[in-house]
């Protein structure tokens, strides 16, 4: 019997020895135990014999480095969020107490401008001419897609019919060389 590893072999031997201890005298079983290694020793031997290749080492190092970079990036993002939140809280409290510094006022104006610009970009679509141009462009794109879909459907149908004629594929309900199902022989005689 071949074993995939030394630990599985020693495990099988110990199980067999336990089973046979009730049948065979104890001295014979103990002689077999002296030969076998403990599980810890067999695992240790396996680890020593298995050496990592250079590619495996490089891959493992790369994985560890990427994991560490992700962790560092996440920590930096969290720190930025905390700093930004703290800064906003300080500015809010200073504004309520009318104690804004020049830099805080500039920062607040910058945020207001940024938010106003994003709102104005969203509201520009409300312009009727721009809206109509966007709709016409969408219609053109959809028409082009429908046209290409129609061409591919026609081509696939044509290919299917050709394969059916050549006999490369079979179609349910058609039996080669026989009359279609449900057709009586009397109908053929009347022709």
Curated annotation (Swiss-Prot):
Family: Belongs to the RRT14 family.
InterPro entries the record matches: Rrt14 (IPR031404)
Function (record text): Involved in ribosome biogenesis, probably through modulation of rDNA transcription.
Amino acid composition bias (Polar residues), ranges on this chain: 35-48
Localization of this protein: Nucleus, Nucleolus
Biased composition range(s): Basic residues: 60-73, 82-91, 147-156
Region (Disordered): 34-91, 145-191
Keywords (A to Z) from UniProt: Nucleus, Transcription, Transcription regulation
Stretches that traverse the bilayer: none
GO terms under cellular component: nucleolus
Entry protein name: Regulator of rDNA transcription 14
């Amino acid at each position: 019997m071949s074993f995939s590893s030394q630990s599985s072999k020693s495990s099988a031997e110990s199980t067999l020895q336990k089973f046979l201890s009730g049948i065979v005298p104890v001295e014979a079983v103990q002689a077999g135990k002296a030969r076998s290694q403990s599980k810890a020793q067999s695992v240790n031997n396996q680890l020593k014999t298995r050496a990592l290749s250079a590619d495996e080492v490089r891959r493992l190092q790369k994985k560890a480095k990427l994991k560490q970079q992700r962790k560092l990036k996440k920590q930096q993002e969290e720190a930025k969020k905390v700093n930004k939140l703290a800064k906003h809280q300080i500015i809010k409290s200073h504004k309520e107490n009318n104690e804004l510094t020049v830099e805080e006022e500039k920062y607040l104006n910058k945020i207001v401008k940024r938010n106003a610009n994003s709102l104005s970009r969203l509201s520009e679509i409300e312009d009727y001419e721009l809206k109509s141009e966007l709709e016409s462009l969408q219609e053109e794109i959809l028409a082009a897609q429908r046209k290409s879909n129609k061409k591919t459907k026609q081509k696939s149908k044509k290919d299917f019919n050709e394969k059916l004629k050549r006999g490369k594929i079979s179609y349910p309900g058609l039996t080669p060389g026989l009359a279609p199902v449900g057709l009586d022989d009397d109908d053929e005689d009347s022709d």
